[in-house]
Amino acid sequence: MKQEVVPILSLSEKEKRFFETSFTWEPHSRNLHKQFHINKLEGVIEHMNFPLPPHRQTVNDFVFLTSGESIRSKGLDKYVFSSDTFFFLPAYQISTHELMSADAKGYYCHFDNEIFTCKWLKPDILAEFSFLQFTGNPLVTVEADSRKHLLTILEHLESEYSPDANYNLDVIRVNILSLLMEVKRFAKQEKVTENAALRIAQQYKNKLSRFIYEKSTVAEYASMLSVSPNHLNKCVKAATGKSAQELLSEMVLLEARVLLRQTSLTVNEIAWKIGKEDPSDFIRFFKSKTGQTPTEYRKTE
């Protein structure tokens, strides 16, 4: 059986796959690069192998355009964006990157969640930013008045990352958080009350996005979060209005849709990949959720 699936790429794997083989590129610091990286788009994008195929990555990233246009996906949704717009992608989310126009300018940045693990920051601080969540809108367009301030922050981050800099992780943390807080002002967000149920629900969503091929029951995810299945279900229900099983089914359905549209796996292989050993069970599940069989869905645009 073929093992084709949407891969989770390490940073080195991503660079090998997405840059031209003739293009030699090395980060300024391999150690820092695993936690944080930033570069201007110009001078780099012409060496990338667009379109980039479906993949996941182990870090969060964003692209900020000051000119030009780009087309990038998050899950099954495709987004076209241009100047003064950020595109944010959380770690382990499925993505493709269709194009970056030749006149595109701006910044690419990635950062690992671990960079925010320190005693003076509250746990799960990234949960405050809807655009960095699995189900959030990845696009944030900023007003012209804020553009100069945001570019100054990005320039500070670029300077801290330069080969000659004796980098300071605290400086990098503060600047990233400053940028995220500024961007948050322009993000379309629902007002959500911070509570334990919300935090557990968000942790559950993040685990689903990362381990959907490995874990197939609510009980397994509850164990990973060190809570009982009943408590997990209550938290998810309170935070989202849906049961933990419903969110699990939604994630399985998303994976199935992506695999049907963007890989050459057979229906039987996809059924096996997402934990449905009986293909007829997968077909019934898929049709109950979409109104179409997997084969019918694959044929539609």
Descriptions of predicted regions:
Residues 158-165, 182-190, 204-217, 235-240, ...:
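Basic, amphipathic alpha-helical hairpins
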